[in-house]
Structure formats: C-alpha cells, structure tokens
Amino acid sequence: MDNKKLNTLIESIDQWVIESNDEKISELYRQSSKADNEFEDIPILKDCITLAFNILLGDSLVGSFKTDLMKKLFLLDSLNNYKDNINEYFEKVNNNITSLNETPLNQLSVLLSGITFLNLYVQINWTGPTVQISPDFTLKNDNKSILELLEVDGETVYKKVKNPIFLYLSKICLVDNYSMLDSCKSSCWWSCRSVMYHQRSLKNATPTFKSLLNERFQIVTRFYSISTLLEDSEEFMDTSSSTTSESKKSIKEINGLKDLASRAIIEQSLVFNYFRQLNKIKESMERACEVSELDCALTGALGKRTRFQTFDTAQLVMEVKNCRQRDDSGDGDNNNEFNRNSSIKREVTNDDPTLLVRPSLIEEVKGQNILLRNVDQMLILLQCLNVKNQNSNNGLTTEEMLPYIQKTLEKSNNWIIHSMGLLIKSRLEIVSSKTAERAVLQIQALVDQYDDPTSSATERINAIYSTDYPARWDLEKEVAERFIGIGAAASAFEIFERLEMWDEAIKCLTFMGKNSRSEELVLQRLEIEPSPELYCVLGDLKSDEQFYIKGWELSKKRYSRAQRSLARFYLEREQYQLCIDAFQIALAINPLFPNSWFSLGCAAMKIEKWDTALNAFSRVVSLEPEEGEGWANLASIYMYQNKMDKASSALMEGLKHKRENWKMWENFLFCCIAIKDYQNAVIAINHIFDLNDKKVNLKLLSIIADHVVSKDQLDKQGISGSKMEKTVSELFGRLTSKLTNNPDLWRLYSSYHHRLGNVDKAIDLQQKACRSCESAHWEGEQSTFEKVLQFNTTLCDLYFQYPNTSNIYSAKLKVKSILKKCESSWKETEHYKNFEQLLIKLNNYESELLQKK
C-alpha cells in the first residue's frame, strides 16, 4: 500500500470513528480479516482497524488489549510488575508514546488506544453494562496513588470510582500527548471528551479544565462546522447527474455530516451548562438547531391530563415544524439491538389512579408521529436544560419542560437518550406529592438497568458524550436524596454509607436525630483511613477550627474545602479578616465557587474593604450571571464609591433575576436620578409602588417632574422633557388613582400641571390635595393644622393668579370655615393671623371682581 493511499485510509478511519460510521468500519474490518489482505504487511494498521471495530461494534472493548499494538505500547503483559509503583508504569507508557515516530499511523494508534481506554472508563462508571476486567487492572491498593495523580486544582476524584487507571491512560494518550496527534483531525474532540469525563469524576468544577475545554471546543466547532465538513467531503450530492441510489447515498452522507456538526455544538453546550456559562448556551443551541435543520416550538392543544377528566383543556405540547428524516439504517438511528418494547417497560408509571403519563390529545399536533433523529432528540433534551437555566424553579418551569421530555420519550430509539429523558422527567415529578413516589422509583429503575441486556455497550457509548447522563455514583446519590425527600432517611443513609459519601451520610443521621452516631461514625472512619474530607466533616460536627486546619495540613495545603469551611467558621463568629484570609487561600486554588466569593464580599463589606468586596462580587456575577443579590451588592459598592453609572448597570442586570425585590428597585431609582436616566426612573417608581405597599418617594418624583417642565432639557438617553410629558402624566394618574389619601402627592401633581400651564387641572388637583389633608380632628394637632392652612393658601394663590368670582367666593367660605374651626386652639399663632390676612385679601379680590362686572 503506497503512502498516499495509507494516509487517506488513516484519515477515513479517524473520520468514521468520530462519526460512528459502523458500516464503513465493519466493511474495513471484514477486509482486514480475509486471508492475503492488503493490510498483512502493516500489522499496526491491522491492529488499528481492530481497535476501531471494537470501539464501534465490538462485544467488548477489552478485546483490544489482545492486539500487539496495545500490548507493546502499554506493557500489558508485564502490568503486574508495576503494581508496587504505578507512577513508574505511567512514566514508561508515556515514554513509549513520546518515543514513537510522529507518523500518521502511529498517531492513529495512540488516538484509538486513548479512545479505547476512555470508552472503557465511561462504560464501567457511567453507562454499563458490567465488563470483565483483568485483575491486573484492578489495583485496590494503588488506586489511591492514581486518584492523587488525577487531582486538579485541589479537587479530588470520587473515592470509589472504578478502574481510574483507564482514565489516566486515556489522559496520557489524548491530553498529555495531544500535541503529537496533529495528523488526526478528531484528536482535539477526543481530548475534550477525556477532559470532560475527568472533570465529571471530580467533586467540583475546576478553572484549569474550564479554560482548557472552552479553548479546545472552539477548535472542535471550527474543524467540525458543517461548511468545513462539506468542503472536506470528497462526495457531494448532485441529483442532476447521479442515479437514484447514488443520490440517496449522498443524502445519507450529508446527513451524517450534519449530525456530526450538530453533536460538536451540543457537546460544547454541555460544557457551557456544566460550568454555568448560561449566557452562551442559548446561542450555541440555536446554531445546533440551524445545522441540524430542527425547528420545534411549544404550542397549545386541547386534551385531557387526568384519567377521569370529562372535558378537554389546553395542554402544552411540542410541535415539530421541520426536521430531517431518520435514516433507514446505518447511522445508529435505527439500531436493531435496542428493543423499543423493553425501553417502554423501563418507564415507571406506578399505575397512577388519577394522572395520565402523557396528555391525551383530541387531535394530532404537527410532527407528533415523526421519527426524530438521535441528534435531534439530543437537541430537544438540551433545549429542556436551557428552559431550566433561563427560569426560576417553579411550577411554570416544570410545565414548560415536560413537553420536551414527552417528545423525547415518544419515539426514542437510543438507550441513553431514553434514559436521560426518563431521568429529567423524574426530576420534574419529584416536586409534586402526587408523583414523588413514582419519580423515586423511576430513578431507582435507572440505577437497576445498568446491566440491562437490551442495549449494547457500543450503542450507549455512542450517545453518552452528547447527553448529560450522570455517573453511576451520582445517580445512586440522587436516589438517596429523593429518599430523604419522601422521609426514608434510613434508606438514604445506607446508600450514602455504601458510597462513602460521608457529608451526606452525616446529614441523614442529623435528620434522624442521631447526632452522637454521626460523630462516632466519623471517628471510626478516621481510624481506618484519615482523609482531609473526614476532618472537615468532623470540624462541622464539633464546630472546631482545629479539624479544618488538620485537614488542610493533611492534604499538603491542596484541599480547598478545608479553607472554605474555616472561612465560614470565622464568618459565623464575625472574625471578618480571618474569614477573608481563609477564603482568599481557598479561592486561589479553585476560584469556581460563587457562594464563597459572595461570602468573601460580604465579609469585606463589613470591615469596609471596598476593593476586595468589589472584586469578590464581580467574580460572583461572572460565575453566576443570574445571581441577583450579587449584582445588588456590587451596585451598593459602586454607589458607595459614587460610580452611579456602573451601579445603575449592575442593578439593571440584577433586576432581570430579582424583579420582586423592591429594595433593589429603590437603589436603581436613586442611581437613575443621579445619572438623569428619567425613563428608567419612571419604571422603578412604578415597581416600588407595586411591591412596597404603595410607597412613593416624592422628592425623586419631583425631580422627574422638573425635567418634564424644563421641556428642552435632555436626559441620559437623550430624551427631552416634552417627550416624557405623556409618560410622567400617566405615572401621576396611576399613582393618585391607587393612593387617594396622600395630600403631598396631590399637591405635587397639581404643581406639575400648573407649571405645564394646565391651570384648570392644577386647581382641581390642589382642591383634592386640600380635601385629603383634612383628616379627622386635624385641627387638634399643630402639624396638621399648619398643613391644612398651607395647602389652602396654595389653592388661594392659584385662584388669585387666575381669578373668577365663583372660585374666590368658594375660597372665602372655605377660609372662614377653617378659621372658625381653629379659633379656639390656634388664634394666637402666626399661622392663624396670616390666614386671617388671606381672608381679607379674598374679600378685597371679590369686591374688585364685582366692580369690574
């Protein structure tokens, strides 16, 4: 085989593996198995074909270990010799790889080996079914050494993870030696997958992996954009010159490329979701739908939700407006190994006597019976996650998410996709007392199906990377958490104890009132195997800082949780500087903890370390853009520093997520007035009025009124006062219609119209102001007495400016009435005497007006 043909074949194998083209790989494997085949002279290539076949179609990935390639490269025949020094084994494997000539064939062999190890690790810990692994790979004593090697940014791998050696070997092949795989186009994508499942094996998100995944997925989505894939493809559809069979083949291949491009974006979106980069998910999801040509939306349809419902009501359902048809065979969309009937049995209905599993519709919705491609089902699951991310956790969000799940479960034909749909459905149902039991049983069924024979390992692996399906230990943890929710704390404790999740186990014991048993359990575990985590748990139980410090020292100052716990210990005792110091140490190791940044910011504000607080809350909102309280505190610091523009922007962001917080609206109002953003100030006043028991800040309202009266003066947005006149007039009208007994508001409203030249309106409003201030027994209090006189004086001044006989006459009668009512109590006061002079002036005015007539 000449070099050109060899290199072309290597590129093809690389492409077929990443797109799961089992038809092409199967055909190639059959050719390589024949006698006198063209691959006999290239044993490494033949082994690579075997590896590729096992990755996509083999009964067991372990079969790849029998190839000479893997035996030699990974020292499989002598693995047992390194049980006492696993570090030496990893070094030798790495040396074997780095010493290879960087030929395309050698690069492909390293890539496929890394994929084999990664898929094995994921199969064992995520998808199942159980695989028989050689005892040489089961290093019970040395697993601790491997777990330490897999620590990143102070975050540890789950202690009871199975066969972490496979994750480390995939890391050596796909991540550590990534630079030598430049001839393999898919190496970047597989590197991302290895990193992502390494991250998902850790207890918390890490900045190192966040940065790495964001950077490399940009390369992946560029390499695997649909335009790039179509350009690189040698065959393209040309219906004008092709036969029908060739045309169908071309359509199928183009659909495969669209699936591949869509999956690249889906996996990037799952990274965004994991690291809470929520602002990026919507855009990437829309791109994926565009590439896959999927157009779906929620709509309403009449139907029944309960078994005994006698009338039809509106149901929220999904309408598929456009999508590509599912292929007849070959792309994994119609895998015969997946038994549809068996999958339906895995959906727990619990024979609910009232609720239907799905709404029964009176007529079919567009796209209801369409067979969606696997990639489109993955996209719908992703859209469901986006609904949850974009909305608060309430009943409306649940109702909006359910149609996505129901659509996925209707016609799904992939084991992992169907399982993911069932899992999300159970998470939604757990909040309702009517469906909580069914939800718990459903998650338990998903745990029990690990060895379900209806789906092969290769089918599960093919879809796992494009879904958010949890690890087996996380799924069992979720079962235990649901048990607590329905009151079965003892059952939950048994699960947590078996999983060695001591934090959660202690919470169960506390929930059951067994506090002494909690401490006893931790001390027992410390005697068996001391760990930083257990010392932190003991510190929580005893409220003693020395245990956090001991855990920190035991971890060689790498376990950031110890410093976070220590910081909260100091925060509770108002030792703010010590709290700040501890948080800064913890966050220097792993800064992806928004709650810790928030607490650090609060502590810094307490001792007026404004720069520290500003940095802390800036980090909070960058990690959690929907954290309204973080935006509010950030704005408070800006306001303290008199940076009103920045404060206003921060509050505007925060109010997107905390619209019911009237205090934030009040701060926003102050900022808007300070920067002369009167349009938003009006919005703020309306919200404060609605949320805070009809409270109105008249001083700030008068500033807005002054702007309108100024006519030509522009505000921050370039809006003149005259253009805001209608808006502000409507604001006054709304406020006074709901707050009728506030004389100061009526007076301000009157003054506003007076200055605009609306005299009759001003007089009418001032009359209402006068009436509203004359409460019962007003003459008995000096303050109310003076206010009544002041308001009526203002009304008379309006009459004097625009006199007519009837107004002056009614004013004279009103003043006489007030003077008579107050004579006994306030006759000797200056206000009373001035009011008497007002009566004289009214009499004179009346005489003058009568003479003119």
Swiss-Prot record:
Q: State the UniProt keywords alphabetically.
A: Repeat, TPR repeat
| Region: Disordered, residue numbers | 324-345
Q: Where are the TPR repeats?
A: 486-519, 525-558, 560-593, 594-627, 629-661, 662-695
Q: Which domain of life is it from?
A: Eukaryota
Sequence ranges of Polar residues compositional bias:
332-342
Q: Which SUPFAM superfamilies match?
A: TPR-like
Q: Which family does it belong to?
A: Belongs to the TTC27 family.
Name listed for the protein in its UniProt record: Tetratricopeptide repeat protein 27 homolog
Q: Which organism is it from?
A: Dictyostelium discoideum (Social amoeba)
Organism lineage reads as: Eukaryota, Amoebozoa, Evosea, Eumycetozoa, Dictyostelia
